[in-house]
Amino acid sequence: MSENSIDIALVQETYLKPNRPKACSIAGYVQLRTDRTYSSKGGTALYYRRSLHCGPINIPPLTNMEATGCRLAMTGHSTLVIVSVYLPSPKRLLRRDLRALFALGDAVILFGDFNCKNIRWGCPSNNYNGIKLDELEDRLDFGIIAPSTSTCFPMSSHIDPRR
């Protein structure tokens, strides 16, 4: 990551478990993670360069989302809260989960896999969570930035995401 000048990386669906606390550590980076303990898969992680003025934050209890976060202090700017979020696809997007995360600070950025599909963001179709997130964008006063290309590459696919 340092070769590509990455300061912060956010990961969802880590599949990491508490019995391997040093799994996936990266030299020169602090690893924060929230492992799913009640079943397989899931989990979130956040890596930040050791030289940054970052620190872990406590995530409030969430009903359907999984999250890991930090506070980033920057000279001349207010503190920024950065959160890696995973919403498993069978779970519903809940307003209370989003509100709890946005309440972590004055400037909060949520990155992650929300499993929300909406044609407004370039998806071929909508799903329940995509419609709900689109509605909540106005009600809770936040913005959505979605990638311009697909981020899902099924295992059976012959697409190489590195190209």
Language-model region placement:
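A shared catalytic/ligand-binding motif for oxyanion handling
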Residues: 1-163
